[in-house]
């Protein structure tokens, strides 16, 4: 567990070898106890807060950024720790006040994972709705695109504007239920917030403000290019653009994915080979990732 600012923590950092999302926590220092932002898939990282002197029964609220199981799968275990815990999610993801797997692709990915659907106690209906816990106020910002009911939670402390954004760099594919047009509008909305610290679902903490802004702008470009690639799977220019954007974002595994795939199509691509040479000390490529996305959508 790592302190971000006073009373705000990252409980489970991103680890590419461990499934689930990043988990964040705010100690309200009030009768509202501890507020978790997303819960992940595994209870053990959350249990670790006990080592820092926290009682797990004091987790009284869990704000869920969107309806993908890697962000809420362990919620039933949180309920076992505190039967009075309240869960929060947007109405467009929590259909009939319940979060459960509805996407067949995600169901296949988590076929071996046992979970219980999550009953949502407080449905977020309106953009900019305020949730107040002790002296802490979370503004609920509806950011559809990755899912229809994606929500970012903005927390303003005395010194920083902190955004808990869920899967802001998530893959947004129109043919898989994403909405690229909505996603672009959502990111543009967030760019106007002057965020100091962005607490992301799969990339940890991004700061300062200039870096957070660069990250958001780059991911608009990434998803625009990714959707183009699905339409034109052999377009080497688009593949190279995706590799270059990934390089700027320091997503080196993605660089290898796109360059390796590009070299299958155009074996003599000097640009692709040069990028691979730049990052050859990083993990080997996983070309199946991009191949699978294209196959699923064609």
Language-model regions: role of each:
Residues 35-37, 63, 87, 162-164, ...:
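Residue-level marker for buried hydrophobic side chains located in beta-strands
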């Amino acid at each position: 567990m790592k302190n971000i600012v006073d009373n705000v923590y990252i409980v489970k950092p991103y680890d590419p070898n461990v499934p689930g999302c990043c988990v964040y926590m705010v100690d309200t220092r009030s009768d509202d106890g501890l507020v978790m932002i997303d819960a992940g898939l595994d209870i053990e990282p959350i249990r670790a807060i006990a080592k820092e002197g926290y009682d797990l029964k004091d987790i009284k609220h869990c704000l869920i950024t969107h309806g993908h199981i890697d962000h809420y799968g362990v919620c039933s275990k949180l309920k076992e720790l505190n039967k009075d815990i309240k869960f929060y999610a947007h109405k467009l993801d929590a259909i009939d006040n319940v979060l459960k797997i509805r996407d067949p692709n995600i169901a296949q990915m988590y076929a071996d994972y046992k979970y219980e659907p999550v009953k949502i106690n407080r449905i977020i209906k309106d953009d900019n709705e305020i949730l107040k816990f002790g002296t802490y106020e979370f503004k609920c910002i509806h950011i559809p695109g990755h899912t229809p009911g994606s929500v970012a939670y903005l927390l303003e402390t005395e010194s920083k504007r902190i955004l808990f954004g869920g899967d802001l760099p998530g893959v947004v594919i129109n043919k898989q239920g994403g909405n690229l047009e909505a996603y672009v509008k959502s990111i543009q909305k967030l760019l106007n917030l002057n965020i100091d610290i962005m607490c992301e679902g799969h990339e940890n903490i991004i700061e300062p403000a200039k870096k957070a802004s660069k990250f958001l702008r780059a991911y608009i470009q990434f998803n625009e290019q990714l959707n183009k690639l699905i339409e034109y799977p052999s377009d080497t220019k688009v593949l190279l653009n995706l590799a270059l954007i990934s390089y700027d974002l320091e997503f080196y595994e993605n660089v290898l994915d796109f360059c390796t795939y590009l070299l299958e199509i155009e074996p003599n691509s000097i640009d692709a080979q040069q990028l691979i040479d730049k990052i050859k000390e990083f993990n080997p490529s996983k070309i199946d990732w991009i191949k699978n996305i294209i196959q699923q959508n064609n």
